[in-house]
Regions:
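Phosphate/pyrophosphate-binding loops at sites that engage ATP/ADP/AMP, CoA/4′-phosphopantetheine
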Residues: 76-88, 192-198, 310-321
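Adenine-nucleotide phosphate-binding core of ATP-dependent small-molecule kinases
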Residues: 266, 273-277, 284-316
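Short glycine-rich, Thr/Ser-proximal phosphate-binding strand/loop in the N-terminal lobe
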Residues: 5-7, 14-63, 229
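Internal helix-turn-beta structural module
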Residues: 296, 300-320, 330-394
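Catalytic phosphate/nucleotide-handling subdomain of diverse soluble enzymes
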Residues: 218-219, 224-260, 266, 328-358
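Glycine-rich beta-strand-to-loop/alpha-helix junction loops that act as flexible
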Residues: 10-11, 93-96, 209, 320, ...
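Glycine-rich phosphate-binding loop of actin/hexokinase-like ATP-binding domains
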Residues: 153-254
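Short beta-strand-loop/turn "lid" adjacent to the catalytic site in phosphate-handling enzymes
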Residues: 74-125, 144-146, 153-163
Length: 394
């Protein structure tokens, strides 16, 4: 019977899971799936490592299964269907670890209490990340759980990259640039040495482009600057998040439009970005397929902001050796990659159009001074590795 670890990534009305089993000392996915629409029309589906459906259930329209009920179903499924593996722990993606957590940590009640302090900094993610942790602590208190943080990878940034120009009394309360998508960037940094040695050792910008988007500047695989700051609403425009915003806009919304904090939070996190600009969709695929000029405006703004941030991060690096595209848009949209690389020509990026169209791993032209890569991210595998290491050190 081999050891296994479950990785959970919980959202507001869904969660994704992956079951990793140890084979020859390496974690291999043996099952993965998701539970969705937990409060309206719950559905659970699981597939084996080859993609074959091995479990499926629907509860019907109007059912309210909730996270607790879905977790109960998942635990039962794992016991029934993957009994050949011994579950040794659970790894969780937790968006915000603040200043306290610079590496993955074994969870107990005190850790949960500490992490709840960061709910206001990541309202779309943090409370939902913590929900399954608390549920499993109550149901299976002896099962080790490990929290892995999207902020930890960036804690090694130089102080100047983390600071806002605010009074020390505010900074000391934890108002800093934290950066996010760290598990994705950490995974990319971990695989670069075997795929792109120059990118691994040099000055590299990784573009995590998806429904949530950010960019990270690395030197020798270590984060030195990133586009997201105090919250995951900063930086690039995203599916529904506005990205970089003049603080004066928030004051105007309060003083002149009479909006309160909750209304502004909803605007910034749920009604802006690609959805807000286009008025059509938060999904880049929908916008790319549309001939509506508002869709074009949203795409143009997205590309423009990426180009601006490329210049900023290249300045922080003092030059540029490689760029890496990852996440849903970065891995799958040859059109967006072409536009970004075109805008980055002044930095020395030259694209191989055919390689880009084929979604090759290396998409830079032979004449390009800056390497260009497409590397799929794997945050779940990163969490599984961390969870195993923490559990082994107990």
């Amino acid at each position: 019977m081999g050891d296994a670890i479950v990785v959970l990534n919980a959202g507001s009305s869904s969660f994704k899971f992956s079951l990793f089993a140890e084979e020859a000392g390496r974690p291999i996915v043996v099952a993965r799936g998701q539970a969705e629409a937990l409060y309206t029309s719950p559905r659970f589906v699981a597939k084996d490592g080859a993609g074959t459906v091995i479990g499926e259930k629907s509860w019907g329209t109007g059912a309210k299964l909730g996270h607790d009920g879905a977790l109960d179903h998942l635990v039962g499924f794992l016991r029934d269907r993957v009994a050949q593996h011994r579950l040794i722990g659970v790894g969780h993606r937790v968006v915000h670890g603040g200043r306290e957590y610079t590496k993955p940590v074994l969870v107990d009640a005190s850790v949960v209490a500490a992490l709840e302090k960061y709910v206001p900094l990541a309202p779309l993610h943090q409370p939902h990340n913590l929900t399954p942790i608390k549920a499993l602590l109550a149901r299976l208190p002896d099962l080790p759980q490990v929290a892995c943080f999207d902020t930890s990878f960036h804690r090694a940034q130089p102080p100047v990259a983390q600071a806002f120009a605010l009074p020390a009394s505010i900074t000391e309360r934890g108002v800093l640039r934290y950066g996010f998508h760290g598990l994705s960037y950490e995974y990319i940094a971990s695989v670069l040495p075997e795929r792109a040695e120059r990118a691994a050792q040099g000055r590299t910008i990784v573009l995590h482009l998806g429904n949530g988007s950010s960019m990270c500047a690395m030197v020798a695989g270590r984060s030195v600057a990133s586009t997201m700051g105090f919250t995951a609403a900063d930086g690039l425009p995203m599916g529904t998040r506005c990205g970089n915003l003049d603080p004066g806009v928030v004051l105007y919304l309060i003083d002149s439009l009479g909006m309160d904090a909750r209304a502004i939070e909803k605007l910034i996190y749920q009604e802006s970005g690609l959805l807000g600009v286009s008025g059509i969709s938060s999904d880049m695929r929908v916008l790319l397929a549309s001939d509506d000029p508002r869709a074009k405006s949203a795409i143009d703004l997205f590309v423009y902001r990426i180009a601006r941030e490329l210049g900023s991060l290249a300045a922080a690096l003092g030059g540029l050796d490689a760029i890496v595209f990852t996440a849903g848009i970065g891995e799958n949209s040859a059109y967006l990659r072409e536009r970004v690389c075109s805008d980055a020509a002044w930095l020395g990026v030259a694209l191989d159009a055919d390689a880009n169209a084929r979604n090759d791993t290396s998409i830079g032209a032979r004449t390009s001074r800056v390497e260009a890569w497409v590397i799929p991210t794997n945050e779940e595998l990163m969490i599984a590795r961390h969870a195993r290491a923490v559990i082994d050190r107990r």
